[in-house]
Amino acid sequence: SRRQRQMCIRDRLDMLLFVEERINTTIERCGSVISVNDFLASPDKMDIFDATCMRLQTIGETVKNIDNLTNHELLINYAGTPWRSIIGLRNIISHEYLSIDPEEIFKIVKVHLPGLLLAIQQIRNDIAASI
């Protein structure tokens, strides 16, 4: 029904907004992180690293849920974003935490998250325009 479709669209928009907020929070809270060593320099810095990993995990989990909710038909339209890698990182953080490479996390935060943010914003805009 039309109402169910609107609810489903609203759920997608809410989930995308959640991802956008998590990305913004991660970028903001890692603003003082200039090198990978900044994640490891002290117990407080290691707390930032751990919190960053947990936010990346929730981003990956939510992306996975969006993909499942849309029967794998939404994210595929945005092929420039490495969705499988985002979900894969979630799996590594969840199941292989001791094997996490701080350099990779640093690179993800500083290099890849801004692009993911743009992709999420584009998807939200495209969905909103289709309502």
What spans do the regions from the language model cover?
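Single conserved hydrophobic/aromatic residue that forms the stacking wall/gate
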Residues: 1-9
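N-terminal first-folded block
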Residues: 12-54
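Generic structural signal for well-ordered, non-transmembrane alpha-helical segments
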Residues: 17-20, 24, 57, 91, ...
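Secondary-structure edge/capping motif, primarily at the C-terminal ends of alpha-helices
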Residues: 26-40, 66, 70, 97-100, ...
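Short, contiguous, well-structured surface segments enriched in hydrophobic/aromatic residues
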Residues: 55-67
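Short, mixed-charge amphipathic alpha-helical segments
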Residues: 68-84
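Histidine-centered, metal-coordinating catalytic motifs and their short helical/loop contexts
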Residues: 82-100
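Charge-enriched, short contiguous segments at helix-coil
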Residues: 94-128
